[in-house]
Amino acid sequence: MYLVVVGVNHRTAPVEVREKLSFSDHQLKDAFSALLSYPSIDGSVILSTCNRTEVYVASLDVDTGLKVVREFLANWAGLSLSDIKNYTYNYTLYDAVHHLFRVASGLDSMILGETQILGQVRDAFLKASSLKASNKILNTLFQHAITVGKKVRTETGIDKNPVSISYAAVQLACSFFGSLKDKKALLIGAGKMSSLTAKHLSYYGIKEIIVANRSFEKAEQFAREFNGIAVPFAKIYDILAEVDLVISCTGAPHLIIHKEQLELVIGNRQHPLYLIDIAVPRDIDPEIAKLPNVFLYDIDKLQNVVTKNLEERKKLAEMAENIIETELKAFIEWHSTQFVVPTIVALKKKAEEIKQKELTKALNKLGNISEREKNIVCALAHTILNQLLHTPIVKLKQYALTPQGHLYTEILQNLFDLQVEGERPKNFTHPREEMEESDEKRSYCGESR
């Protein structure tokens, strides 16, 4: 089997094209059914997010795999094959492995190092598995990719420093309070930036989100989405007297919160008020920063943090690329030795059959012996067998990485007259389950490998 991926993302296609190529959860069953109806496709995983759609397949042939996936996407989206070729990118074989490792690590995302994509890769794999669309090689690939994504984040910390204004605002709020779990926040505005901010606040466990917007209907809709409270725009100053945090992002051409009016309502506050203004033009009067127990941060201060963090992420991305290269080599080494696995399975099977046959003869000749003596004989046979097989198996795996690997495999098969079933030396397969099965507990003498 050969690995092929065809994808579209925010860099290659506009949103009106990406939305046609997206897959909702309830569409996946039909999508996989269509893909797997092609004789050349043995397995598939579909990764579909806001900014990307990628179709991974295990195909009998690279060129056929590319052709099939493009045809499938064209039919799905109602686009021409020419459009699909223009808007998509593709990777095959180990380039596809390298690409998925980068995707899972957040290095191919719109926001460098973002964390959400790793969960999306995991979900895509689990959905494909639950629908029985994936196969052995795709299972191994995605499991490895998820491990790589975790390793990159653990060893580099690339996801720690915020590189979006909304996330930076919430991180700043966390630095004020330590925890948001007993805090109330007022969001002024109900647009995209406020929505992102609300998601981050919810993630960090904010006690309550209050939203004010000039359109009260939109404020109510926003509040329902985040389990918050909507208030009329005219009530902003009343709310300012009770909240701990204000994050404002409207499209107003003038100030929303003025120093004189705020001063009138916060006189009896016993705790500080933090205001973060991420609007351009500004929503909050900069003179407010002069009030006692009031702390104001504007978008320029946040942008400085974001710029600095983005530069840091770029440095960490270089470390991440090194990790990915190391993991890619490990994957290639694993895959390059897979053609010897059926031979190893056959060797173990034949050796086990000989062991069991000779043990039966020996135990029959020994007659009535104790269970302890029987176990000693079985253990001896088991140890001799393992020690005899260990070196040939290790050497064969080593030779598999050389140009003579197939020759050594054939020599071993001939020397031991092995019957190797379903051997496909150059295929992109993963017969690990067969190895595990051969290593299971043996019925005779209660031995296990």
From Swiss-Prot:
One of its GO terms (molecular function) is glutamyl-tRNA reductase activity. Its EC number is 1.2.1.70. Keywords: NADP, Oxidoreductase, Porphyrin biosynthesis. Pathway: Porphyrin-containing compound metabolism; protoporphyrin-IX biosynthesis; 5-aminolevulinate from L-glutamyl-tRNA(Glu): step 1/2. Substrate binds at T49, C50, N51, R52, S109, E114, T115, Q116, Q120. The active site is at C50 (nucleophile). Gene3D superfamilies: Glutamyl-tRNA reductase, N-terminal domain, NAD(P)-binding Rossmann-like Domain. The record marks H99 as: Important for activity. Signal peptide: none annotated. It comes from the Bacteria. Catalyzes the NADPH-dependent reduction of glutamyl-tRNA(Glu) to glutamate 1-semialdehyde (GSA). Belongs to the glutamyl-tRNA reductase family. This is Glutamyl-tRNA reductase. The lineage of its organism: Bacteria, Bacillati, Bacillota, Clostridia, Thermoanaerobacterales.
